[in-house]
């Protein structure tokens, strides 16, 4: 299974096409729209979210509420397009049109300058329109489809915010996926710790007042995962590696870790490895989950636990120094409408990309042509691994 996305931040809209879904899987527009709505929430979002009320249009691949096995095409309209029709016109416009909003002062930390160099754009709007995090709208749409597939197979995905601006949630125990879903949805910053959430919101407000931005850490947990997804036989078949790549591919994300993550470097092996248990009711389990649900690049039946770190958004209302590409003189960087903190929304994007990679791994392991046979094969596999 694979997907492609297309579209610019202020263009007519965003498109994604998914290929490889099994036939007969239940899927409605509302399954996607509820995820799009979650992405638009969170304390610290900018004015754009008051304009865009994202709704998906499914234009191919589904009939009477079920997938056909053909490519599924989805489109999300940009409501703000009406204000950008000249700037983002498909047809040519006069080169010196006053509405062109040409960008010649690249923003530090963005794709602007290097993207302009790479593709020969002397107007870096050609770069920033595509590199914008607005593209994650349709990544969340694709992830919503993956989450629906996993849900039907008894696999659930939940994300939450662990840290913002140096304030970290004080979590004294592991949370079930259902608990994470319920508690994070009730929080303006998608945090499970109410005390930390209040401090996070204050830090976001302070950053906004100062024309600054802050980043943080999100965590995604996947429960009900069967053992044996991914493989150890080749480096590029390891599922944890694929998930790490997906996490770091999200705009502004700079790292990923599983389980205890980088803390493993500070602990002896006896405190890191997860002891193996067996019971007639549950089959093989682990006493702990320090490895985040992976051994040898494969799922081991424990929940997948992955975290991603997001840098502060590089668009600052108190802009940093840059250089004008025309005059080569020093100026303050260009300012585009942006958020002061997008970490809560990014947790929803992280859910989407993790769900996608797990769904792909499921379809790689089991028959993916028909959804009814897929469900049957997953259940048979669960029984086989339990009795091993």
From Swiss-Prot:
Q: Where does FMN bind?
A: 130-132, 251-252, 296, 311-315, 337
Q: Name one Pfam family in it.
A: Chorismate_synt
Describe the protein's quaternary organization and the partners it interacts with. Homotetramer.
Role played: This reaction introduces a second double bond into the aromatic ring system.
The reactions it catalyses are: 5-O-(1-carboxyvinyl)-3-phosphoshikimate = chorismate + phosphate
Q: Name the GO cellular-component terms.
A: cytosol
Main EC class of this protein?
Answer: lyase
User: What is the official name of this protein in its record?
Assistant: Chorismate synthase
Q: Where is this region: Disordered?
A: 95-118
Which InterPro entries is this protein grouped with? Answer: Chorismate_synth (IPR000453), Chorismate_synth_AroC_sf (IPR035904), Chorismate_synthase_CS (IPR020541)
BP-aspect Gene Ontology terms? amino acid biosynthetic process; aromatic amino acid family biosynthetic process; chorismate biosynthetic process
Cofactor section: FMNH2
Keywords of the record: Amino-acid biosynthesis, Aromatic amino acid biosynthesis, FAD, Flavoprotein, FMN, Lyase, NADP
> What's one GO MF term for it?
FMN binding
Recorded hits in PROSITE patterns, A to Z, give: CHORISMATE_SYNTHASE_1, CHORISMATE_SYNTHASE_2, CHORISMATE_SYNTHASE_3
Q: Does the keyword GTP-binding apply?
A: no
In the Enzyme Commission scheme, what number(s) does this protein have? 4.2.3.5
Q: How is the cofactor bound?
A: Reduced FMN (FMNH(2)).
Instruction: Provide the organism lineage as a comma list.
Output: Bacteria, Bacillati, Bacillota, Bacilli, Bacillales
Give the record's family classification: Belongs to the chorismate synthase family.
- Binding positions for NADP(+) per the UniProt entry: 39, 45
| Pathway(s) annotated for this protein in UniProt | Metabolic intermediate biosynthesis; chorismate biosynthesis; chorismate from D-erythrose 4-phosphate and phosphoenolpyruvate: step 7/7
Q: Which SUPFAM superfamilies match?
A: Chorismate synthase, AroC
């Amino acid at each position: 299974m694979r997907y492609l996305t297309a579209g610019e931040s202020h263009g007519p809209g965003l498109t994604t096409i998914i290929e490889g879904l099994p036939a007969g899987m239940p899927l409605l527009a509302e399954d996607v729209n509820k995820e799009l709505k979650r992405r638009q929430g969170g304390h610290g979002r900018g004015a754009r979210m008051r304009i865009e009320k994202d709704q998906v249009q499914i234009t191919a691949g589904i009939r009477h509420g079920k997938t056909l096995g053909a490519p599924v095409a989805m489109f999300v309209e940009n409501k703000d397009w009406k204000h950008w029709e000249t700037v983002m016109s498909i047809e040519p416009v006069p080169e010196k049109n006053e509405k062109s909003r040409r960008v010649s002062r690249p923003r530090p930390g963005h794709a602007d300058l290097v993207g302009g160099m790479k593709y020969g754009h002397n107007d870096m709007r050609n770069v920033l329109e595509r590199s914008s995090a607005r593209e994650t709208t349709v990544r969340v749409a694709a992830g919503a489809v993956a989450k629906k597939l996993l849900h039907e197979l008894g696999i659930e995905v939940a994300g939450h915010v662990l840290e913002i601006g140096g304030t970290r949630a004080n979590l004294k125990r592991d949370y079930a996926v259902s608990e994470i879903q319920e508690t994070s949805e009730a929080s303006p910053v998608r945090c499970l710790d109410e005390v930390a959430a209040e401090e996070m919101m204050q830090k976001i407000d302070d950053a906004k007042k100062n024309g600054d931005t802050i980043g943080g850490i999100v965590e995604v947990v996947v429960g009900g995962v069967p053992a044996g997804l991914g493989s150890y036989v080749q480096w590029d078949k390891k599922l944890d590696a694929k998930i790490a790549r997906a996490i770091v591919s999200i705009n502004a994300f700079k790292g990923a870790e599983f389980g205890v993550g980088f803390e493993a470097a500070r602990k002896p092996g006896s405190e890191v490895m997860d002891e193996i248990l067996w019971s007639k009711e549950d089959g093989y389990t682990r006493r702990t989950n320090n490895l985040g649900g992976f051994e040898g690049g494969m799922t081991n039946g424990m929940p997948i636990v992955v975290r991603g770190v997001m840098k502060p958004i590089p668009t600052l209302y108190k802009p940093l120094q840059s250089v004008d590409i025309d005059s080569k003189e020093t100026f303050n960087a260009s300012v585009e409408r942006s958020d002061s903190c997008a970490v809560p929304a990014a947790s929803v994007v992280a859910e989407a990309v993790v769900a996608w990679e797990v769904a792909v791994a499921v379809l790689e392991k089991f028959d993916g042509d028909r959804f009814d046979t897929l469900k049957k094969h997953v259940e048979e596999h669960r029984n086989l691994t339990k009795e091993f």
